[in-house]
Amino acid sequence: MINYNFINNYKNLNIPIIGPTANMPSGGFLYLNPLLLFKDLGQGLISLTWQKLQTIWKFAENCDLIMATGDIVVAAIAYSTKLPYVVFLSADSSYYEGRINLGLILPKLLNNSRCLKVFARDALTAKDLKLQGIGKTEFVGTPVMDNLTSTGKNLHLQPELFTIAILPGSRLPEAGRNLCLLLKLVREVAKVMGVNVCQFRAATVPILMFELEAIAVSEGWQYQGNKLTFLTQEYAIEVICYEDAFADILQHSNLVIGMAGTAIEQAVGLGKPVITIPGEGPSFTYGFAEAQTRLLGSSVQVIGKKIANNFLLKMFSRKIMFPMIVPKRSPRFIVVIAE
């Protein structure tokens, strides 16, 4: 399984995808709902996995080194190639539980003589792994923060207004459902803050742009170009969507409202306060959002413990306060969410 947003990114960098790909019902988040395994199996998970393994083994015949990114699964696949390999444990962090449960197999894979190096996603995890006997572990930085320089994309921002980034995620159809929920929250936030105070910019994946018109119709918004507009007799709310301005939107935002994984980590890495909302999933549920707060700390605030309805969104929007602006041209916010 591979996120189709990643496929597009690889293609843009002229990096070929050598094996078959498919979107599975679980989205790769079986630990959040193990029952989705049966749906994955029904969608051909076993045959897909076997095809991937065959592709990897054949391709490895012409390789000198395997770079595996993920968890025990990719580490095991790298081991199976019989080549030297390096593992980046991107899916594991000691911030979740204080100590990673490595089990019986993963230490053998990481301590194998063909495993040349293990990279951890943070310094705490590197220390934990070393204490558990994985002496070749290092933390040298977080790769997801490497390419977040603003490109100079014109976001048509008004400098005197607060900028709020909207991050619905990258996996469809979930990202579409997430955006519907986020648009409901945008309406409530605009009521609290005022439409002449804030402006909204959404960073979406290219495939979601094709769904914007249907999303607008379902939520009572108007759609034109890359702009979603909600009209009332008193005011208009605009959410302008971009498929190619993720870094620019994050860099210019004063607050992030999102339902995503890596994108939220990147926002926090840039020092942005973040509000998240549990959704239907399969990936961004309350369980995921709660774990994310353990990973990222108080920079992330989760609204509620279940899928938000209109009443909850209205209630929590009134608890969001933006009282401090220092200095005038560089807004900073204290975001308070009280339950």
Name the predicted role of every residue range.
Residues 1-339:
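Nucleotide-activated sugar donor-binding and catalytic core shared by glycosyltransferases
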